[in-house]
Amino acid sequence: MAIKVLVVDDSSFFRRRVSEIVNQDPDLEVVAVAVNGKEAVEMAAKLKPQVITMDIEMPVMDGITAVREIMANNPTPILMFSSLTHDGAKATLDALEAGALDFLPKRFEDIATNKDDAILLLQQRIKALGRRRMYRSSSLTPTSTIESRRSTIAAPETNTPRRPLSSRLASTTTPVATRSSLSTTSADRHSANPTTSSISSIRASGKQYKLLLIGTSTGGPVALQKVLTAFPANYPHPIVLIQHMPAAFTPAFAARLNTLCKIEVKEAENGDVMRPGCAYLAPGGMQLMIERSGISGRLKVISGTQEMNYKPCVDITFASASKAFGGDVLAVVLTGMGADGREGARMLKSVGATIWAQDEASCVVYGMPQAVASTGISTHSISLDNMAEAILKESSRG
């Protein structure tokens, strides 16, 4: 049965084109369109769509207000369309905090010119959000309660890469991988649905860590906010965050996290020397590498090859960390589409690093975490509600 979609936008052109694109996919069906947030709230209650696409700036009622009302009364997966501006980034983050699950840049030229990748991406995102049941987390931030959802593994966010990942990682400016380090092992035959580890079952390893890595995609802004706001100002290690996000969005996201967290959060800059208690967010549209500099680490921001599906790419950063810090790394893969992070995590594990994944039930999209959990790369699958406590418990021994 096709996933029922409600399209909300005050632009008649955008409503028509989004509806056409959605209806091109036999697994999707537009059941109605709305011209403002007020109509969206009413139609969500009446029609019970499985996914809503939502504009932000609309008359009568804006998209953010509509998201709040829908999530309060008829919780539904919502995909926001956002302009690639500083104000657009801030508004999108507000919408995600209000309960929207994902966003896409609102590019009229892509929609108008029938760009295949833009069409496929929209269809994939809607299908990923439509394959889920409700999951209610405890309060995700000091200021709001956000909904999370469960889903089956979703398709990648973009088309199939032109070259194997091993060669694409090797083509970055810092050698980070060998073909043998990417080979499939017996761990790849592990269960596709690992059980969730309780806090009591996670025993601190006593390892002396030097770095915490967190990689994520769809659902990541809310998940990162929940985890990082629980960290004390004196968290003992540097933190590197890799979130799939456009270049216009990462400065605003880093600034928002910095205002909410006790630790310092900043967008990573080329040459940054990593400090304990500071989180460095990979800049959108670039690749973030980690290099060893004495007893600490230094960050290198590069443009990277165009053949990588993601900028920033979790695999790239994880792989560079395996070379720079070896086993002295705790790496966590949170909610996200696709499998970015799996091969980088495999490299980290091969040198003795600790890998954890978010559990299926608390993910917005169980793609990236499943990629490391089902292959046996991660040692624990942990609920988002327990992730910060688990990280602090493990880090305290470092």
From Swiss-Prot:
Gene Ontology terms, MF aspect: phosphorelay response regulator activity; protein-glutamate methylesterase activity; protein-glutamine glutaminase activity
GO biological process: chemotaxis
Active site: S217, H244, D340
Main location per the UniProt record: cytoplasm
Enzyme nomenclature, EC number: 3.1.1.61, 3.5.1.44
InterPro entries named among the record's database cross-references: CheB-like (IPR008248), CheB_C (IPR035909), CheY-like_superfamily (IPR011006), Sig_transdc_resp-reg_Me-estase (IPR000673), Sig_transdc_resp-reg_receiver (IPR001789)
CheB-type methylesterase domain location: 205-398
GO cellular component, one term: cytoplasm
Region (Disordered): 133-200
PTM summary: Phosphorylated by CheA. Phosphorylation of the N-terminal regulatory domain activates the methylesterase activity.
TM helices/strands, residue ranges: none
Protein family membership: Belongs to the CheB family.
Domain statement: Contains a C-terminal catalytic domain, and an N-terminal region which modulates catalytic activity.
Biological role: Involved in chemotaxis. Part of a chemotaxis signal transduction system that modulates chemotaxis in response to various stimuli. Catalyzes the demethylation of specific methylglutamate residues introduced into the chemoreceptors (methyl-accepting chemotaxis proteins or MCP) by CheR. Also mediates the irreversible deamidation of specific glutamine residues to glutamic acid.
Protein name (database record): Protein-glutamate methylesterase/protein-glutamine glutaminase
Organism of derivation: Shewanella frigidimarina (strain NCIMB 400)
